[in-house]
C-alpha cells in the first residue's frame, strides 16, 4: 500500500506540474485576448450586477435559484482552506512574491470562469424532476460539433468530478476541520465527524435550494468575518506594510533569489514565486476546473452571458479579496521564516495563526480555526452539488441522487477520523483531470464565447 501511495503521489506531482499550470493559465490568457479583454473591461458591471437587488430574485428568466445564490453556492465550494492554508504555503515555499502571481493567475482566470459558466447555462437541460442540469459535461455533449468526441469528454469529466467530490471536496475538508478543532479546542475527531455528517446531511438532503439558501447566508458572513479580522491584523502592523509590499513585488520579479527583511530566512526567486503562486491561485479560485459551472447552470437568468459575468466575480472575491487579506496579514506581521519549538519552519495554517496572533493574541488562533471550519464546511456543501450533478449525468437519471447525498454525508465522517493520503492524492489527480476536457471544450468553443460576449455589449451600454 505504501508503494502504491508513493506512485499515486508521483502521478499527482506530475499532473499538477508546470505543463498543467501553463495550460490552465495559458487558456485564460488566450480567452482573454480572444474576447478582447471584455471580462476585464466589464468587471465593474459584473460586480454591480452581483450586488444588485435583482441578483437576489428569480424575476428574470428560468432557473432553480437566484443569480446571487448560484454564485454563493459556487463560492461555497471555492472559498476553502486554500484561502488560509494555501496562501501561507505558497508564501513559504515560493516567497511572498507568490501573492503577485496569484493575482496574475486570477486576472486571466476571470475569463476562464466566465466562459465555462456562460457555456454551462447556454447548454443546460431540464431533468425529469423539473430541475436544471448543466455544466461542462452538457456543454461538451451538446456544444461540440463532433458528438462522439464530445460524449467521451463529457463522460470523463463527470467521472473525474464524482471522484474529486468525495476526496478534495469532502474528506480533505473534513480532515482540515477535525484537525483544526482538535489542535485548538481539543475536540475529539469522532465528535467533529458526527456533527459534520449530521449537519451536512440535514442541509444536503434538501438539494440545491437548501444548499443555496444556506450558502447565500454563510458564505458572505464568513468572508466578511475573515476579512474584518484580517484587516485588523494588517492595520495593527501597518508600519510594516510598506516594506512588506516592497518585498512582495521584489521577490515576484527578481531573476536572482532574494530574501531578508520581513521574510526571515526565506529566500526565493521569480521562478519559485511564479510556480507556487500560480499553482495555489488555480487551486484557490477553481478557474478552468469546471466545477463552478455546474452550479451556475442552476441560476435563474434570461441570458447566459449575464450570469457568466456574475459567476465570474467568484474569482475576484476568492483571490483578489480573501487570499489578498491572508497574504498581506502574513507579509506585514513578520512571521515568514519563523520556526517552532522543534526548530522547524512554520508553514500552512501555523503561519496564518502566527500572523493573527501578533495583534489578536490567543484569540487570533481561535479566529483562524473558526475561519478554517466555516470555509471547509461550506466547501463540502458546494462540492456535494457538483458531484451529485456529475453522478446524475453518468447514470442518465436523477432517481439515485438521494443515495448519493446520504453516502456523501457519511463519507465526511471518514475524512474527519481517518488518514487517507492515498484517496486524497487520487482525488487530487481526478481534480486535475477534470480540467483537461474542460480546457479542450473552451478552446474549441472560443469563437462562440467571443461572439456571445460581444453581442451582449449593447445590453451593458444600455444600463
Where are the regions that the model predicts?
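Selective recognition of specific alpha-helical transmembrane segments in multi-pass small-molecule
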Residues: 108-116, 194-208, 219-239, 271, ...
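Helix-loop-helix module between adjacent transmembrane segments
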Residues: 27, 31-32, 105-130, 136-137, ...
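Flexible loop linkers connecting adjacent transmembrane helices
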Residues: 37-65, 89, 94-99, 103, ...
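Extracellular/periplasmic helix-exit of transmembrane alpha-helices
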Residues: 116-124, 128, 229-249, 255-265, ...
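N-terminal alpha-helical transmembrane segments of multi-pass membrane transport
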Residues: 1-81, 91-98, 109, 409, ...
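Membrane-interface loop-to-helix entry segments
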Residues: 23-30, 34-47, 157, 174-181, ...
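Transmembrane helix-loop junctions in multi-pass membrane proteins
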Residues: 3-4, 34-39, 82-87, 165-178, ...
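Alpha-helical membrane segments and immediately flanking helix-loop junctions
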Residues: 57-93, 119-143, 156-162, 263-316, ...
Amino acid at each position: 500500500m505504501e508503494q502504491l501511495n508513493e506512485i499515486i503521489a508521483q502521478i499527482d506531482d506530475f499532473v499538477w506540474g508546470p505543463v498543467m499550470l501553463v495550460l490552465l493559465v495559458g487558456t485564460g490568457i488566450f480567452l482573454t485576448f480572444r474576447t478582447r479583454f471584455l471580462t476585464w473591461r466589464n468587471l465593474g458591471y459584473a460586480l454591480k450586477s452581483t450586488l444588485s437587488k435583482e441578483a437576489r430574485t428569480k424575476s428574470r428568466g428560468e432557473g432553480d435559484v437566484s443569480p446571487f445564490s448560484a454564485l454563493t453556492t459556487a463560492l461555497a465550494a471555492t472559498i476553502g482552506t486554500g484561502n488560509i492554508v494555501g496562501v501561507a504555503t505558497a508564501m513559504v515555499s515560493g516567497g511572498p512574491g507568490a501573492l503577485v502571481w496569484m493575482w496574475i493567475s486570477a486576472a486571466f482566470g476571470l475569463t476562464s470562469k466566465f466562459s465555462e459558466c456562460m457555456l454551462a447555462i447556454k447548454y443546460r437541460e431540464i431533468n425529469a424532476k423539473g430541475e436544471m442540469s448543466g455544466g461542462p459535461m452538457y456543454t461538451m455533449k451538446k456544444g461540440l460539433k463532433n458528438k462522439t468526441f464530445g460524449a467521451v469528454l463529457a463522460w470523463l469529466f463527470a467521472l473525474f468530478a464524482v471522484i474529486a467530490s468525495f476526496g478534495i471536496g469532502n474528506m480533505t475538508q473534513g480532515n482540515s476541520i477535525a484537525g483544526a478543532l482538535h489542535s485548538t479546542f481539543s475536540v475529539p475527531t469522532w465528535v467533529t465527524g458526527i456533527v459534520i455528517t449530521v449537519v451536512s446531511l440535514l442541509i444536503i438532503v434538501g438539494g440545491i435550494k437548501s444548499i443555496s439558501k444556506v450558502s447565500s447566508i454563510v458564505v458572505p458572513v464568513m468572508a466578511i468575518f475573515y476579512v474584518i479580522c484580517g484587516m485588523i491584523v494588517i492595520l495593527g502592523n501597518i508600519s510594516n506594510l510598506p516594506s512588506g509590499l516592497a518585498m512582495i513585488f521584489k521577490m515576484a520579479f527578481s531573476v536572482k533569489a532574494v530574501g531578508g527583511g520581513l521574510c526571515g530566512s526565506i529566500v526565493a526567486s521569480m521562478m519559485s514565486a511564479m510556480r507556487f503562486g500560480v499553482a495555489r491561485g488555480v487551486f484557490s479560485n477553481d478557474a478552468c476546473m469546471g466545477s463552478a459551472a455546474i452550479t451556475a447552470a442552476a441560476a435563474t437568468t434570461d441570458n447566459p452571458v449575464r450570469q457568466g459575468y456574475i459567476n465570474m466575480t467568484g474569482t475576484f472575491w476568492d483571490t483578489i479579496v480573501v487570499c489578498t487579506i491572508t497574504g498581506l496579514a502574513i507579509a506585514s506581521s513578520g512571521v515568514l521564516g519563523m520556526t517552532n519549538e522543534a526548530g522547524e519552519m512554520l508553514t500552512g495554517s501555523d503561519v496564518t495563526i502566527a500572523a493573527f496572533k501578533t495583534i489578536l493574541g490567543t484569540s487570533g488562533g481561535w479566529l483562524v480555526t473558526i475561519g478554517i471550519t466555516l470555509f471547509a464546511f461550506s466547501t463540502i456543501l458546494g462540492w456535494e452539488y457538483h458531484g451529485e450533478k456529475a453522478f446524475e449525468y453518468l447514470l442518465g437519471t436523477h432517481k439515485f441522487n438521494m443515495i448519493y447525498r446520504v453516502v456523501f454525508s457519511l463519507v465526511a465522517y471518514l475524512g474527519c477520523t481517518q488518514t487517507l493520503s492515498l484517496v486524497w492524492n487520487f482525488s487530487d489527480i481526478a481534480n486535475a483531470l477534470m480540467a483537461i476536457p474542460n480546457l479542450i471544450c473552451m478552446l474549441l468553443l472560443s469563437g462562440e464565447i467571443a461572439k456571445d460576449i460581444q453581442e451582449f455589449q449593447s445590453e451593458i451600454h444600455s444600463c
